[in-house]
């Protein structure tokens, strides 16, 4: 465990994670300073009186005088103020690094462009089904520092590329990069390989690396080695097996579960299940209880979630599809009896939308594009696209045209922040309108 006594500590970013960092240091007899670029950041009213704070920007004087900066994942290491501090020799970490220095139980670490939250939650459910005292969080749910507990037997963490950039002490018992597709390109000026390099940090010092056999970008830089276990649709140690119209999860040649016993549906969710099973096996969770968890897990909100089924029309809320790869996963292998009414739009974060084009063929699909990058998305196939300012306008436009057998799918391929507070609010608005219009 690290010693922070007599250290001048500055925390950048409040909110729940920032407050967890403040509590962490106060519990160790260190009073940090806190700064936030927002004028009234969430959690400001919960800061103890003795903690100095600076809001509405960064305080370069504090940063340069610090021994340790704990930076929120929301601020880029390339920010001039952080670059100057780093050049002056100030150590810069994130909350995950603080956590890794303290955690005594094994850690399962999960990253990737898509599916992270589902796989993280699934592995957590597998551990609970086995009676293991598990802490689940990180980039979802509770901040990692709030999970620390001497009685924990296992930690399961979802980690973003931003969190991994400031983490060097992670020694995961099992780690995975589920997939790598363009996301956050506004934070990675050198492109996909720079983003990938941040993700691959999860494998450093890991005992077992769970890689995606269908995505070469998930392999460690030096290639697969004896630490690697693979999952995939048709290839890998953990893969899908299709026979006589049935689909099975298969492990090293052995059928272990028929997918019809799972509550989750869709090929992308079946591969998420394989990844979760590989991680659970890697840390010694009993196979029987892991498979039991797969049969009871109903999925997460806003992730290909059935919002309404009425008059033969299914309205699907996949608002968590905040990047192109996530929407590709939703469309890959999707079966619709009638017409697919696809809602796309929001803030594309400088992404290339062209990989979506191959899923937008045929005469049984209509596009409704909205938000900041609606025009770019409509340009993928203009003859079947209609562009509106807002998602609500798009839904009111399509509603009179849906027929039994159709599907209305919100899988926007974009972030929501141009028009919504977050992807959850976007999904809630979709669900409310589906119930009104359906």
UniProtKB/Swiss-Prot annotation:
Q: What EC number(s) is this enzyme filed under?
A: 6.3.2.9
One of the GO BP terms on file: peptidoglycan biosynthetic process
This protein is called UDP-N-acetylmuramoylalanine--D-glutamate ligase
Q: Which family does it belong to?
A: Belongs to the MurCDEF family.
The gene for this chain is murD
Q: What GO MF terms are annotated?
A: ATP binding; UDP-N-acetylmuramoylalanine-D-glutamate ligase activity
Cellular component per GO, a single term: cytoplasm
Keyword Cytoplasm included in the entry's annotation: yes
Catalysed transformations (reactions): UDP-N-acetyl-alpha-D-muramoyl-L-alanine + D-glutamate + ATP = UDP-N-acetyl-alpha-D-muramoyl-L-alanyl-D-glutamate + ADP + phosphate + H(+)
> Which HAMAP family does the record match to this protein?
MurD
User: Which source organism does the UniProt entry give?
Assistant: Salmonella typhi
